[in-house]
Amino acid sequence: MTTLEQAVKRFTPLDPDLMAKRLGRPGPMPRVIIDTDTANEIDDQYAVAWALLSQDRIKLEGVTAAPYSFLHHRDGLYEAVAALQDGGGSDHDNKFVGPFTGWAKRLMADGRTADDIEFVTPDVGEERSYEEILRVFEACGVSHEGRVFRGSQEHLPSYEKPVESEAAQFIIDQARNRDDGPVYVLAMGALPNVGSALLMAPDIIDNLVVVWTSGFPSYSPFSNEPSLNLVQDRLSSRLIYECGVPHVYLPGYHVGAQLTISLPEMKQFVKGRGAIGDYLWHLYTNNPLHKKYAISQPETKTWVIWDIINVAWMLDAAYVPTFLTTSPHLDEKLYWQKDPSRHGMLEAYDVARDAIFEDIYRRLETAP
């Protein structure tokens, strides 16, 4: 079986000057592909809509559907519920039940069990994401013909078996269109489409910039296992940091996590702003994750619109401040291992939360 180290040998390191250029600010009307697990929750829809309503600032080449799945949560939740039903002690809870304790307790208080939770498989997640992308295009009054592509229905099985899909081929074709400049892939989910494209065509790293949101800052001491975008496809996640593709890393925890919005804000600035405003309002007030995680009184709580950070970085440098660092190793346990001798990576350290949402609100005012 091909190891990560062996797979990386197929990639020719970029000249440092070209890497620096690719990690600089995008030029006018940059070419963009959005790779999104759109139906995973409700944040991707905001990001896709914002991009569709901002086509005077970016050239949105297409949107590719990424798979998602919560199967990796299933065993932990079942074990947590069983432990609580058996009256496990605190030591047992800490070592065995772990991060699923709160979820399990809320489910039980709601009169439900782990059997009541749907754990979709990646192929179902991809299909739902594809259908959701079409709904967002329609709500924005934009034709999807020739611009929405089906993605991988599984996570990368091995480094010698990239998953062929419309999405992976579209990424390759756009990256090889070098006459039109680099293409920025705004990756908002797990990375099988991107990882497969890179493995199928290692030459594309000279004209591709991966803008990905996931995980903790690269200087964090924590395991990135809590990150849904990162943990689902570990092979592709590790490949991104090793292969030398220009990478703008947008940490979810502590950075993107600031992008919260409340019910009153939704009511005042989003609801009634065209068909897409009403659709985003519907998603917010019928958030499927409220039921899934047994969240009570959702009207008193905000929700993180994580994935708008990708579009924000594309549109305005002031929206997402960054610093130049080196690409860390992501080890098998999903911890960062820093190495100052590595190739460069651009990393976000903050967001201008209010300015970002104000931009979205202005765009919604123009929605059909």
Placement of each model-derived feature along the sequence:
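Short, basic/glycine-rich phosphate-binding loops at helix/coil junctions
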Residues: 147-155, 289, 337
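A glycine-rich helix N-cap at a beta->alpha junction
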Residues: 85-116, 125, 132, 136-147
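Extracytoplasmic/secreted proteins, especially bacterial periplasmic and envelope-associated proteins
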Residues: 46, 128, 132-135, 166, ...
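Conformational coupling and interaction surfaces
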Residues: 2-32, 46-62, 89-90, 228-231, ...
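Active-site histidine-anchored catalytic micro-motif
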Residues: 3-94, 111-113, 144, 151-263, ...
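Short gly/ser-rich anion-binding loops that grip negatively charged ligand groups
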Residues: 119-126, 157, 161
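Extracytoplasmic/periplasmic, Sec-exported soluble proteins
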Residues: 39-40, 121, 125, 303
